[in-house]
Amino acid sequence: KGGKTQGRSAKSSRPEFDWRDPLVLEEQLTADEILIRDTFRTYCQEHLMPRIVLANRNEVFHREIISEMGELGVLGPTIKGYGCAGVSSVAYGLLARELERVDSGYRSAMSVQSSLVMHPIYAYGSEEQQQQKYLPRLAKGELLGCFGLTEPNHGSDPGSMETRALHNPSNRSYTLNGAKTWITNSPVADLFVVWARCEDNCIRGFLLEKGMRGLSAPKIEGKFSLRASATGMIIMDDVEVPEENVLPKASSLAVPFGCLNNARYGISWGVLGAAEFCLHTARQYTLDRIQFGVPLAKNQLIQRKLADMLTEITLGLHACLQLGRLKDQDKVTPEMVSLLKRNNCGKALDIARQARDMLGGNGISDEYHVIRHAMNLEAVNTYEGTHDIHALILGRAITGIQAFTTDK
């Protein structure tokens, strides 16, 4: 009897597999990280999810969302001081995951504000003229920023940019001419972080403010992706920018690339939130949908697809966790970020497409949200380094040979 009792006791104490957290990510998070995530999840589900269908249908970006996020303290969250939260990189990733679980467009707006506007000002800006002037208002969501690097003729090759900055020593200013395109937030931005080539051939960062003469930001219409975020151009026609608006510690292309790596890190987390939504939706739909007298989920093909989705999401999340811990130890390389940006975006897009298919005809209805995630992820797989560009970054690291151009 004693043996049988011990056997039953041992069996009952055996851990149970939880498909919602297969490798127990929860136990590897700090109490603060869990609290931050759960608080923001509540906001996202209660305040953003009810808006997203109509926002996406009507191609409308709700500017007040940024102010709401500012009140929650999630803008520039890893920055210390200036009204920012100073949280861990993992906490930032968890925020991106919860936001993109609702919509990639919303995450894009937050990501640009935090990683591509606030980060360069914090890392490369002057203390009084730039950091103190802009960061507190950006953190509160009073100001909304954008990041201008991509140009009409130069996407994956920003080093060939045509935007020029001419120095005017007499009045201590620069004159900027050129155009940037596919710029998240630009039509509604108050602050523009723009990269331009100067006469000494150095690429420098400039802070342009809404209302400067010669500066315009027309909206790009007709997008089939990221419809709930504002995307546009930045047109500069003899825009005069004072010297005090030049980022003093930024004088090479490595600087905007460093900013992009910060954003790519957040994207790697974010896309898995979208993928998780698609997995959960496909699972519930195939459990509820009866065909040939049984749930679709009884079909072996369906179960294999769900298993594949769960596997990729789980591996991606734990890789992100490791990358976040390394980031806080200042041990991250650009190649590490490229590996996860490329893998997680590609896998998330595949998962969204599979989920769309599993929902049958209902899969193309925005009421189920999956088609919106699929369309969004098409863009996320492309921006901030395409799937192929990140492959070349990794290929160069593996072989020691760059394959971006035909140069020997």
UniProtKB/Swiss-Prot annotation:
One GO term (biological process): L-tryptophan metabolic process
Cofactor(s) this protein requires: FAD
GO terms under cellular component: mitochondrial matrix
The organism's place on the tree of life at top rank: Eukaryota
Reaction catalysed by this enzyme: glutaryl-CoA + oxidized [electron-transfer flavoprotein] + 2 H(+) = (2E)-butenoyl-CoA + reduced [electron-transfer flavoprotein] + CO2
Function: Catalyzes the oxidative decarboxylation of glutaryl-CoA to crotonyl-CoA and CO(2) in the degradative pathway of L-lysine, L-hydroxylysine, and L-tryptophan metabolism. It uses electron transfer flavoprotein as its electron acceptor.
Protein name in the entry: Glutaryl-CoA dehydrogenase, mitochondrial
Annotated source species: Sus scrofa
Gene, per the UniProt record: GCDH
